[in-house]
Amino acid sequence: MVDVYQKETARHVMVIDSKSFYASVESVDLGLNPLKSLLVVMSQQENTNGGLVLAASPQAKKVLGVSNVMRQRDVPRDPRLAIVQPRMNYYIQKNKQINDIYRKFVADEDLHIYSIDESLLDLTDSWRYLESKYHRTLTDYEVARIIQQEVRDATGIYLTVGIGDNPAMAKM
């Protein structure tokens, strides 16, 4: 069988997600490691008739069984658990800071912001620039690691990165 796609240009697409974004932002501001802290971002009681968990750190989920949208009354009482109120405008500022870092790797038309914690980067048209900037041939994995490190250094936020030839493959 003839591979009709072999002459097609390989694309470099990444779907990037900030790990437990709201909880991570709050953990960093408290001087805590976002992957190790026990923290939840809880809505105010008067808005939800008891408060809802808007975000939980990975450890709060793992150790205490906290889940997003859990009611305040169902959150385990644990002295190690930090409960903070949401700061939506601040999260928007942090999201802008992260997306500005992405703009160091792609042009605006190749940055697709899907939500406050998820963006798609099509690095295909920037690939030669990136290789000249870093003075070597790069793999998708290496570029993903560079982006993760730049965001972590600037914000303290950890990222997960899906890599593929198209958005669907990168999202998997």
Name every feature range the model reports, one short phrase each.
Residues 1-120, 125-128:
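Residues that scaffold, gate, or flank divalent-cation-dependent active/transport sites
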Residues 85, 133-137:
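Active-site oxyanion-binding pockets that recognize sulfate/phosphate
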Residues 104, 129-132, 149, 153:
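Fungal eukaryote-biased detector of long internal structured cores
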Residues 122-123, 130, 167-172:
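Short, well-ordered, mixed-charge alpha-helical segments that flank or form enzyme active sites
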